[in-house]
Amino acid sequence: VILVVEGSPSYAMRALESIQNQDLYDLQIVVVCRDAAPGVRHSLQVAADRDIHIDLIDVEDAKRGACLRAGFAASRGSQIIAMNADEWLAPQSLSKMVDIACDTAADIVFPTVSLDRYDAHRERHSRVLNVAPIVIEDKSSMVSGLSQLILGGLVAQTSGVMYSRSLFEACLLCDKVFRTVGFMACALSRAQCVSGCGDACFHAAAPKLTDAFDPTMYAKVSDDIRALDELADSLSEADSGGRLKLASQKFYFAGLVACIENLCLSPHGVSSIERSARMRDMLEAPRTRQMVAALKDNHRGLGLLFGPIASAKPTRCVMCTHLAAFLNRTGAKTA
């Protein structure tokens, strides 16, 4: 397990202890520190001195992915899991995933993922991404299995997932950025067998969409859907019913809605002129119009924003975004 610790995360020791407490003896924990606060670094050093399973290394390279590469270089295991200090493993999850990997010879094992956020009273609120008992062994099963992963949101979850060592190395050599759909698409395109382990649970921090405006968010969504489209195109012969293409369109719609929410609801956002311009660019993007055309007869359950997005009306999108946020706060349901 590669645990990356940067800055002064308040939950670093919880993450480490969740790995140490796994019911698995043959385990190496590589803790990679970069710019870690002195107090956090000291606590990790004390833990490493007490546990022979822990290898603690420091990284000064500021390049993206340097911590992961250093951690992988120091690792020796046949299976790899990478995670950050604000994430943690539920008890016995690791051993259950190892059992699945050994029983099915899987290159990738997905756990159930709990996306956690904490309110002002430090109470945890979770959204669970359940992994179906999938077994992907050929292109036909890849279409059905990948459709489930896309619709369930797990295709964007790279941390907490177990990879075979050779597969993880291949993705790193392709210079794919971890925590992107591009990394997962690269892994899935090379995997011989993929399995799901619903009994294992990995806790990750829920994405924060409205804390601050992120001008790069739509570019990231565009990169993600491009990687997903390339993977879907490679499986087009097996996707005779168009399930995979439909799942990709819904994934893009969800990402677009998140971008619109970030643009409209961020407390420290942008001017109304810039907001309208950015909104228009997203609504008129060729990929957005393609999605609208694909989902126009299958948009039930997509919420209030599909209509304004389909009509490419920036003002209506802003109004419906605020209305949807109000209805979510009050607990009202929308079609």
PLM regions: where:
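Membrane-interface aromatic/basic loop that binds lipid-linked glycans or pyrophosphate carriers
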Residues: 87, 105-106, 265-335
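Short, well-formed alpha-helical segments that are part of the catalytic scaffolds
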Residues: 7-21, 39
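Glycine-rich, basic loop-to-helix element that forms the pyrophosphate-binding segment
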Residues: 59-75
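Catalytic core of nucleotide-sugar-dependent glycosyltransferases
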Residues: 199-207, 212-240, 258, 266-288
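Donor-binding/catalytic cores of nucleotide-activated saccharide
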Residues: 88-197, 204-217
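Short aromatic/hydrophobic "clamp" motif used to bind/position activated sugar donors
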Residues: 80
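Acidic donor-binding segment of Leloir-type glycosyltransferases
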Residues: 20-58
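Active-site acidic Asp-centered loop
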Residues: 34, 83-85
